[in-house]
Curated annotation (Swiss-Prot):
GO MF annotation list: structural molecule activity
Region feature (Fusion peptide): 482-503
UniProt lineage: Viruses, Riboviria, Pararnavirae, Artverviricota, Revtraviricetes
Protein name per its UniProtKB record: Envelope glycoprotein gp160
InterPro entries per the UniProt record, alphabetical: Gp120_core_sf (IPR036377), Gp160 (IPR037527), GP41-like (IPR000328), HIV1_Gp120 (IPR000777)
Residues making up the signal peptide according to the UniProt record: 1-25
Residue intervals passing through the bilayer: 657-677
Source species of the chain: Simian immunodeficiency virus (isolate EK505) (SIV-cpz)
Region V1: start-end pairs: 124-144
Cytoplasmic compartment segments: 678-835
Residues forming coiled coils: 605-639
Location of the region described as MPER in the Swiss-Prot/TrEMBL record: 634-655
Cited HAMAP family: HIV_ENV
Motif YXXL motif per record, residues: 684-687
Length: 835
């Protein structure tokens, strides 16, 4: 019996412990502000450059209006233990740079002269330099043309002459097979609108840095030989990209960035191959000879700059490429062959001159160079340079817009420019089964920017996060809002992104401060840069763009604070709520797994699909809490009775008085109606409204017999009424009877339900009391057992200690007596010896 009772006690204890554990393990939604989480985003980037306003160079003019000065101390923060996906072929930064470079060119050409008046008949003849005694074979490349133009007065014309390259004019009579054409026109007149480049500008680019506005960041991939697509394991966050030179070219990429180790080939899985070299190859372009530039008035306020004469050698321009090209090109071909079989490398098969040739701008002149020597089989010569023959064109089709062209005014004196080849643009076509033909191409300038921006992506900082927590918001109390201080760098905010959620949450307040202070710091830096260079900055649409970047950060911060306010978490870095956490939101992961093994970035990806549901529940909970808080605050009005006599509340008292009087009148009317109903039940009704007719009793009602009559009462009187008022009264009476019976039934059911509820509650309380008494008995029993065991233990210990003490005392006494008896034993021994 005792064993059974002990088993029962242990079972109850286990059940209680399990119940306490279940109740204690319930998780609640906790809001965190300042978590290192980001998401892919598209936003307006602003640019920085080392532009000089006093320079007349075209890019400097554009950069002065569009860019702020560069940061002298750029920051880069590594993010350990983070893997990020990149896609260079779907990068909004490339599209933005494309639009910006188009704006650069269009702004540079906007104030320049349109050459529409030059679409006239040109009378041309072959030109030969009179100052050059060398036998020249290329003299036919220039034509000496005369034509009529409008003078300063629109009704007057005059005849002028100019030298044109053969590539810039075409004969009017295209059917003449003799080749003795004398009448020409400009090549663009039937296709594009040509603008003459302003004479005081050049096209030498300067590095441009693209920067993310506050509230956003640029993620950079630092993996070696990264192909621009897929996952990157070594990432960092920066505020600006490296300096990118907007060099316009085809076939070859000039003055770009180099690969860190091996040659990297990037493919968009369509028909484009971007090759990034691991070492630069010098290319030196030269236009020998000396042009003299004249000017012709072609209308009021319009000047056409023409070539008057060429002094010296008139041979074509050329570019010299270092012989190391052959080795690098052979390595590149081998890498491509290893990935694809049956490959044939050829020069460009044909098309626009800008695509079939290497088109670059050198010193203001547009060079069109034949690159066949670069992409055909090499002769094995390892000395000297590779010389590319080039042609100069003054009328060029612009790559920025279809149907637009540019006339490059002639440049005086010799021209020479040195660049570095850092990449190649290749295209391939597939013929048959696994047969590829690869050739150099160009024209799509986005590939130039994509080669530089492949390792960058823009992300938006999402500092608000939700996660399960063990704490619950129990009471509604007023708390002082924490004020975030200023201090750390904004980029350091993402430094804890690779840490686990538990480790990152320890410094959450610091993270939140970094977020806000970083936003403020970025804006202050931007504003100080603008103020410091306000004598250089010419505010235009680009200035408005900078101001928009500043306003965007404040809008994002205010939006976050508004969301936190809707949840009752304004000004808090960690906010507890009373919304239960649903384990399905976290894929049934345990609390320890979430906080010990996952980063905030991984956690955000897991619960992102449930964010809307969680946020909605947080808003509903806060609304309910606001209602509860309002009700609680309304109870405070009872604390001061003296305010009841305030004159401002008299109208409220009058309203209450009217409501009480109306209630009394209503109760009186209801009592009268109830009295009438009671009388109706007793059989009373106005005589004028009733007529007695016999009716047969139902089987459920027994017949009654009158006391002084011997006849049975076979019926009772019912009313047979006629007339509107009588019918209305009868209907009203029946309605009241029906309502009375139903109300009586409902009241009886309610009374019975309340009685059962009272009995069940009483039984439950009795069971709880019995359980309490039983548990108290168990606790008392085990307490007594523990007390008895302790007493027995103490008694046993005391007895053992006493016995040991007695033995020790007895031993000490024996030793002492032995020592005391030593003289006696000596004396007795001496006595025996003397006897």
């Amino acid at each position: 019996m005792k064993v059974t009772e002990m088993q029962k006690n242990w079972l109850i204890c286990c059940l209680l412990i399990g119940l306490i554990k279940i109740i204690g393990s319930e998780l609640w939604v906790t809001v965190y502000y300042g978590v290192p989480v980001w998401r892919d985003a598209e936003t307006v980037l602003f640019c920085a450059s080392d532009a000089k306003a006093h320079s007349t160079e075209a890019h400097n003019i554009w950069a002065t209006q569009a860019c702020v000065p560069t940061d002298p101390n750029p920051q880069e923060v590594l993010i350990p233990n983070v893997t990020e996906r990149f896609d260079m072929w779907k990068n909004n930064m490339v599209d933005q740079m494309q639009e910006d470079i188009i704006s650069l060119w269009e702004q540079s050409l906007k104030p320049c002269v349109k050459l529409t008046p030059l679409c006239v008949t040109l009378s041309c003849s072959s030109w030969r330099s009179v100052n050059n005694s060398v036998n020249q074979t290329n003299h036919v490349q220039m034509q000496n043309c005369s034509f009529n133009v409008t003078t300063e007065l629109r009704d007057k014309k005059k005849q002028v002459y100019s030298l044109f390259y053969m590539g810039d004019i075409i004969p009017l009579d295209t059917n003449n097979s003799s080749g003795n054409n004398s009448q020409y026109r400009l090549i663009n007149c039937n296709t594009t609108a040509v603008t003459q480049a302003c004479p005081k500008i050049s096209f030498e680019p300067i590095p441009i840095y693209y920067c993310a506005p506050p509230g956003f960041a640029i993620i950079k991939c630092n993996d070696q030989d990264f192909n621009g697509t897929g996952e990157c394991n070594n990432v960092s966050t920066v505020q600006c990209t490296h300096g990118i030179k907007p060099v316009i070219s085809t076939q070859l990429i000039l003055n770009g960035s180099l690969a860190t180790s091996n040659i990297v080939i990037r493919n968009n899985s369509k028909d484009t191959l971007l090759v990034q070299l691991n070492e630069s190859i010098p290319i030196n372009c030269t236009r020998p000879g000396n042009k003299t530039r004249g000017q012709v008035q072609i209308g009021p306020g319009m000047t056409f700059y023409n070539i008057e004469n060429i002094i010296g050698d008139t041979r074509q321009a050329y570019c010299e490429v270092n012989r190391t090209w052959e080795q690098i090109w052979n390595t590149t071909k081998q890498i491509i062959i290893n990935n694809r079989k049956n490959i044939t490398f050829i020069p460009n098969p044909g098309g626009d001159l800008e695509v079939t040739n290497l088109m670059i701008n050198c010193g203001g002149e547009f060079f069109y160079c034949n690159t066949s020597q670069l992409f055909t089989n090499q002769n094995g010569n390892t000395t000297g340079n590779i010389t590319l023959q080039c042609r100069i064109r003054q009328i060029v089709n612009l790559w920025t817009r279809v149907g637009k062209g540019i006339y490059a005014p002639p440049i005086k004196g010799p021209i020479n420019c040195l660049s570095n080849i850092t990449g190649i643009i290749l295209d391939y076509t597939k013929s048959g089964t696994e047969k590829y033909t690869i050739y150099p191409t160009g024209g799509d300038m986005t590939n130039l920017w994509r080669q530089e921006l492949y390792k960058y992506k823009v992300v938006s900082i999402e500092p608000i996060g939700v996660a399960p927590g063990k704490a619950k918001r129990h009471t509604v109390t007023r708390q002082k809002r924490a004020a975030f201080g200023l201090g750390a760098l904004f980029l350091g905010f993402l430094g804890a992104a690779g840490s686990t959620m538990g480790a990152a949450s320890i410094t959450l307040t610091v993270q939140a401060r970094k977020l806000l202070s970083g936003i403020v710091q970025q804006q202050n830096n931007l504003l100080r840069a603008i103020e410091a260079q306000q004598h250089l900055l010419q505010l235009s649409v680009w200035g408005i763009k900078q101001l928009q970047a500043r306003v965007l950060a404040i809008e994002r911060y205010l939006r976050d604070q508004q969301i936190l306010g809707l949840w009752g978490c304004s000004g808090k870095s960690v906010c507890y709520t009373n919304v239960p956490w649903n384990t399905t939101w976290s894929n049934n992961n345990s609390y320890d797994t979430i906080w010990g093994n996952m980063t905030w970035q991984n956690w955000d990806e897991q619960v992102r699909n449930y964010s809307g549901v969680i946020f909605g529940l947080l808003e509903q909970a806060q609304e309910q809490q606001s209602i509860n808080e309002k009700s609680l605050l309304e109870l405070d009005q009872w604390s001061s009775l003296w305010n009841w006599f305030d004159i401002t509340k008299w109208l409220w008292y009058i309203k209450i008085f009217i409501m009480v009087v109306a209630g009394i009148v209503g109760i009186r009317i209801i009592s009268i109606i109830m009295s009438m109903v009671a009388r109706v039940r007793q059989g009373y009704s106005p005589l004028s409204l009733q007529t007695l007719i016999p009716t047969t009793r139902g089987p459920d009602r027994p017949e009654r017999t009158e006391e002084d009559a011997g006849e049975l009462d076979n019926g009772r009187s019912v009313r047979l009424v006629s007339g509107f008022l009588a019918l209305a009264w009868e209907d009203f009476r029946n309605l009241l009877l029906f309502l009375y019976h139903r109300l009586t039934d409902c009241l009886s059911i309610l009374r019975r339900t309340l009685e059962l509820l009272r009995q069940n509650i009483h039984k439950g309380l009795q069971l709880l009391n019995e359980l309490r008494i039983y548990l108290w008995g168990i606790i008392a029993y085990w307490g007594r057992e523990l007390k008895i065991s302790a007493i027995n233990l103490l008694d046993t210990t005391a007895v053992a200690v006493a016995e040991g003490t007695d033995r020790i005392i007895e031993l000490v006494q024996r030793i002492g007596r032995g020592i005391l008896h030593i003289p006696r034993r000596i004396r007795q021994g001496l006595e025996r010896a003397l006897l």
